[in-house]
Each structure stands twice: as C-alpha cells, then as structure tokens.
Curated annotation (Swiss-Prot):
Keywords: Cytoplasm, Gluconate utilization, NADP, Oxidoreductase, Pentose shunt, Phosphoprotein. This is 6-phosphogluconate dehydrogenase, decarboxylating 1. It comes from Saccharomyces cerevisiae (strain ATCC 204508 / S288c) (Baker's yeast). It is an enzyme of class 1 (oxidoreductase). Present with 101000 molecules/cell in log phase SD medium. It comes from the Eukaryota.
Amino acid sequence: MSADFGLIGLAVMGQNLILNAADHGFTVCAYNRTQSKVDHFLANEAKGKSIIGATSIEDFISKLKRPRKVMLLVKAGAPVDALINQIVPLLEKGDIIIDGGNSHFPDSNRRYEELKKKGILFVGSGVSGGEEGARYGPSLMPGGSEEAWPHIKNIFQSISAKSDGEPCCEWVGPAGAGHYVKMVHNGIEYGDMQLICEAYDIMKRLGGFTDKEISDVFAKWNNGVLDSFLVEITRDILKFDDVDGKPLVEKIMDTAGQKGTGKWTAINALDLGMPVTLIGEAVFARCLSALKNERIRASKVLPGPEVPKDAVKDREQFVDDLEQALYASKIISYAQGFMLIREAAATYGWKLNNPAIALMWRGGCIIRSVFLGQITKAYREEPDLENLLFNKFFADAVTKAQSGWRKSIALATTYGIPTPAFSTALSFYDGYRSERLPANLLQAQRDYFGAHTFRVLPECASDNLPVDKDIHINWTGHGGNVSSSTYQA
C-alpha cells in the first residue's frame, strides 16, 4: 500500500494529525525514531485505519506516492535540520518536505533557500489548535514553495477546521511566511491571554468577585462580542474545583512559562520598527510573574493604595465597563498584529493574503473567535486596508467602548491593580490618533547631544530651516555643525 503522505514524529500532535487525515480518506505512513512508538500506535489508535508504519527512514520514503510528501512534527531547531539532512539524499527533485513544528521563520527562510538549490520543495506550515485541533480540525498556515501547494492543498484543506463551510487553511506566501504568520498568531495569543488575566484580576481584587462569579461573567461575555475559545476555557477553568471543593486555579503558582514565540514576535516588531506594544507587554508580564521571590519581598516593603470594600459601587456597570475594556484592547491587539504582518510583507517582499489569514484564525486555533469573522470581512472589503482601526466597524466599536475602557483602567490604577496590557492598548490608541506627538522635543534632544539632525514642519520652513532637509543646530554656540552618523540615541 502506498501512502498519500508521510508523517515523522509520533507525539500526540503527530498521532492526532495522522488519525485526522485517515478519517478524511487519506492513507498515511507513520514513522518515529523509536520503533516501539510506531508499533504501539499501529496496534491501538491506528488499528483498522488507512495508516501504515515504517521501520526505517528508507522504508518510510519507499512507501510514499510521488511526488513524496513528508511532514515533520518534531522539536523545532536542530532536530528539524538533522532530519532534513537525513531525508534529502533519499528524495527526488519535486518531492516535498513540510515542517509542521513551531519553527522560527528565519530558519524556514534558510531551509526554503537550501532545499530550493537541491530541487526539493519546502513548506513551513503553522499548525494551531493543540491536540484536539490536530485530531478534529486545526488551523493550518502553509507557506514556502508555491509549486507544492497544488499537491498538498486537498489534504490540508480537508483536514483543517472549517468556518462557515470554508477551510481554515489557505496558502500564505513564500519562504518562511507560513511560520511567520503562525508566530504572529502566537504573539496575539499571548496578548489575548494577558488581557483575560487582567480582567480576572480586576474582578477579583477590585470587585471582590469569587471565582464562580467571575466564571459566570466570562460565560455571559462568551455569548456576545467576546465569544472565543480563550474566554470559553477561562469560564471552565474558574469553575473547576479540586477534590477538596476549592477552586483549583487558586492553588496554581502565579508564575507563567513561555516557549519563546511571543518573544520572537516582540523582537521582530522592534526589528521592523512597528509599535506592537500589547504583545510586548504580554511577554514582559510573564517575565515579571517569574520573579516570584522578589515580588513576595516587594509586597512587604513597597507601599501602595488599599482597596476599600466599596471600591465598586455598581457591579453591573463595573462588569459592562470591563467588557468594553477587554473588547477594545483586543481590537488594538489584532490591529497591531496585522500592522506587523503588513510591514513584514513589504520588508520581506511577500505578497500575503490578509482576508485568508484572518479566516485561517477564525476556527481550529487557540485565538479562534467570532471577532475574527469581522476582520475577514474588513479585509475582503478592502484588501489593502492600512489599519483595522480605519475600518468603520472597528472604529465604531472602539469609539463605543472608550468610556468603559478608560474607566476600568483608571479605577484599577487608582487602587494599584496592574494592567500592563489594557494600559498599553489604550496608550497606543491615544498615540495613534494624535496628530502631533512630543517626538519633536525628543528629536531636538538627539540633535543637541549627538548632532543627529531633525526636519521642520512644512508650515514652519524658512531660509535657515529649509523643508525636506536634515538640519543640525549648534544649540549652545560651542559645538560644531557637522552631523553625526556614528553616535545614536
């Protein structure tokens, strides 16, 4: 029996993706470096399905239909390169290697170029949705060698999640574009999770809500504009009790881990000069949470305001305001994410399909939500939309949410409740809508101490301050008039 495609890596994600493909009528060849894993999988979960095993890499390759389609679901980094180097000598020109792991997009760029020279087609595909998504329909974000797409399109779109009947999978773009979009997806995921945690913290510490009451609030929100996977699971987590009848969430150490994809997004935003502030703050919030011992010490020596029992006088209005704050901040997070994708496309020379990207995230993935349907609609109406905030639906939504957004942050700040993600979202919004920012003074400072020059406003131009010219002023009368390009502030 020949397989439609093969998959290497039989951890839970790999097994579930194979089972998903078999359910959709595809024959899959499974391989793992530990043979016992293959044997156990074939004898149990895969029994009776169109799944075959292989005893070696050579045996694995020999069982694939041409062009061979090899999907890797192994740990990102060196293991991917090692496996590719092992497989390539056994392949022919036109065969396809698909990396479905959480690889960093520069690695995918490199692999794309290296394999291109050897005539091998490379696809770097983001896979989102966790174990359940892999089994019943993930969000898939493939990019790389576009010649590979006709050969894998039917498989990928068949096994992917569906939203309103459309597959949550479409070709993203060349080189590492697929893994880039997955990286931004993960960064937005960081932001969404942090915003939800801040809403939980505000309700608990400021409103005195119990976990069950907060769960009820999230349940209500999940029936409205905030309907999403993360709000849904938060509802479930907060009502889950341990064996002693107490909320399990209260027993969990308040130190958050991270695998690095949020950090990658924040660093890339800095590299491209994009103010993706919310994802950055979400990453730093996790870093701060890791300083548990220092925070315990600081809590004993650094004073702050006490929260009075009557801090929240109208619970219903308080919850409504907080819902608006969460909704508006979420809009900012996605606006920033798509700003970054837009800039990446321009910088890296990629032609990316924003409506398709939004649709891919509409179902099957961790950030899936009803909200993404509006983003898909916005980009379908205007594919070159500069910013989501210029779309009438989102502009109106933020305008309507402003009052509750500002009140929630002001109240939390008054009583010392940290809101890094909420606050940076609002600061970005206020900065973005400001025709004039204080960067004029900043640029004057740079010119004063480093001769970095500045430009004048067209309406302020004169003979000594010409328009569209880099100008340096001798601010003290003691310096020179030579512009510096070596000392940067």
